[in-house]
Amino acid sequence: MVPTYSYSPTCVEIQPGSTMDILFPVTQDKKKTVWISKTYPWADGWFAGGMTSNGEVTADVVYAGFGVTAPELGYDDYKDIDVKGKIVLVEGETPNISRNPDSLAMWYKHTLHQTKLNNAAAHGAAGLLYKWVPGPNAPYNPGFVYCHVTDTVVNDIFRGTGKTYKETIRQIYKTQKPASFHTGKRAHIKMNATYNPNATGKNILGMIKGSDPILCNEYVIISAHLDHLGMIPFLIEGANDNNSSSAAMLGVAEALAKSK
């Protein structure tokens, strides 16, 4: 049997008018500070967060490393730094460089988008600049705006701080200690987004019942997705990711059906 069924994922539709700017302080007459804004083009500078809230925020930018709070691992990017009402700049993944399976398992939950975004919101951040490519499994936090940023934006934020991004991240990996700091920059994030908690998607399910009287009650699931990531910001070739996998899955299904 090959039934088609619907499901209801949550989604956010990004509308025209969304923007992201970095504001740089310039001191005039040794007394007055004015803020000069630099607007970054979509794709070259930023991408909207997949589950961003609708809204607009301007706030100081705090670099918060990997955005991880892991007391069980003795690591906290938010320790001794106030991000309430601020916009945090965070990395994807974690500072863990070990390939040991046990170590990877302990750090795993801190690699997830939802963990990082929820953690930033829990610390009172008003928004987030995410130095990582868009991906699934992000949570929706009402009133919390975020976007993904490229190296161009990150390097501009670090400029004039006495630090470089490359050396800062290298030291975190080397010492396994946070290096969070106030950057002295501000960011303006405007997301024109519509949240839809009841979007409709469709899947196709095919099932071949097993012949063993005992094992027929157990299942092996083979799956693939047809959707394509597009530009993130580099091109993901849709013919390969993930249509080649979808074609392989259909080939496996045909072979199994014929061998029954």
Ranges and model annotations:
Residues 45-76, 80, 140-238, 254, ...:
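Soluble metallo-hydrolase cores and metallopeptidase-like ectodomains found primarily
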